[in-house]
C-alpha cells in the first residue's frame, strides 16, 4: 500500500511539472520581449547614407541603366554589388559593405532571382558609378521590421560577424 501511494505522488508531481512547463512554453511574448527580438530598418536612410559616401559621377552609359532600374532585378543586382564590393574594394574604403548587406532585408525575394544575370562590374570606378545609379533608383523603399539574430552570451565569440539576418 505504501508503495502504491508513493508511486502515485511521484506521478502526480511529474504530471504537475509537465503541465507547468507546457504552459510556460505556450506563454505569449510580452511587448518588452518582442522589442528585444525585432528591430526596424529605415531602408531609405540606408540608401541615402550609401549615396552620400559615393562620389558624384553618375553612370553615363545607358547599356545597364534599364537593368539597374528594373524592380525585378533589384535583389539580384544587390547581391552582385555585395559580391563585387569584396573584390573591387576589399578594404571597404567607402564603408558601405554592412549597409549593402542590410539592404537585403529591404528588398523582397522572388522565385527567379537566381536565374537573372544581374549587373556586371568591371572595376572600382564602374562599381561606384553603377552602385550610385542603382541607389538613386531605390527611392521607394520603406522601413521594415526585422528579427534580430540571437545575441551571443557574454564572453563568447560570434562566428558570423559579417552576416546580417533579416
Curated annotation (Swiss-Prot):
InterPro entries associated with the record: 4_helix_cytokine-like_core (IPR009079), IL-3 (IPR002183)
GO BP term (any one): response to hypoxia
Subcellular location: Secreted
Presence of the UniProt keyword Transferase in the record: no
The UniProt record lists the keyword Secreted: yes
Main location: secreted
Region (Disordered): 145-166
One function term, GO molecular function aspect: cytokine activity
Coiled-coil zones: none
One of the Pfam families matching this protein, by short name: IL3
Signal peptide per UniProt: 1-26
UniProt keyword terms in alphabetical order: Cytokine, Disulfide bond, Glycoprotein, Growth factor, Secreted, Signal
Source taxon at top rank: Eukaryota
A GO CC annotation given for this chain: extracellular space
Disulfide bonds: 43-106, 105-166
Tissue: Activated T-cells, mast cells, natural killer cells.
Consequence of gene loss (knockout): IL-3-deficient animals show no abnormalities. Analysis of steady-state hematopoiesis demonstrates normal numbers of peripheral blood cells, bone marrow and splenic hematopoietic progenitors. However, they show impaired contact hypersensitivity reactions.
Glycosylation sites: 42, 112
Family named by the database record: Belongs to the IL-3 family.
Quaternary assembly: Monomer.
Name of the protein described by the UniProt record: Interleukin-3
Organism of this sequence: Mus musculus (Mouse)
Encoding gene per record: Il3
Amino acid at each position: 500500500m505504501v508503495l502504491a501511494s508513493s508511486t502515485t505522488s511521484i506521478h502526480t508531481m511529474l504530471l504537475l511539472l509537465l503541465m507547468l512547463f507546457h504552459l510556460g512554453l505556450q506563454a505569449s511574448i510580452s511587448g518588452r520581449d518582442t522589442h528585444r527580438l525585432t528591430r526596424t530598418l529605415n531602408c531609405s536612410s540606408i540608401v541615402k547614407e550609401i549615396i552620400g559616401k559615393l562620389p558624384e559621377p553618375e553612370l553615363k552609359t545607358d547599356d545597364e541603366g534599364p537593368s539597374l532600374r528594373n524592380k525585378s532585378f533589384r535583389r539580384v543586382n544587390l547581391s552582385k554589388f555585395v559580391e563585387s564590393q569584396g573584390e573591387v574594394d576589399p578594404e571597404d574604403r567607402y564603408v558601405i559593405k554592412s549597409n549593402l548587406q542590410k539592404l537585403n532585408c529591404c528588398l523582397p525575394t522572388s522565385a527567379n532571382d537566381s536565374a537573372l544575370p544581374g549587373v556586371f562590374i568591371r572595376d572600382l570606378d564602374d562599381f561606384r558609378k553603377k552602385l550610385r545609379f542603382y541607389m538613386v533608383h531605390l527611392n521607394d523603399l520603406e522601413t521594415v521590421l526585422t528579427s534580430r539574430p540571437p545575441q551571443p552570451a557574454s564572453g563568447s565569440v560570434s562566428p558570423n560577424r559579417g552576416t546580417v539576418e533579416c
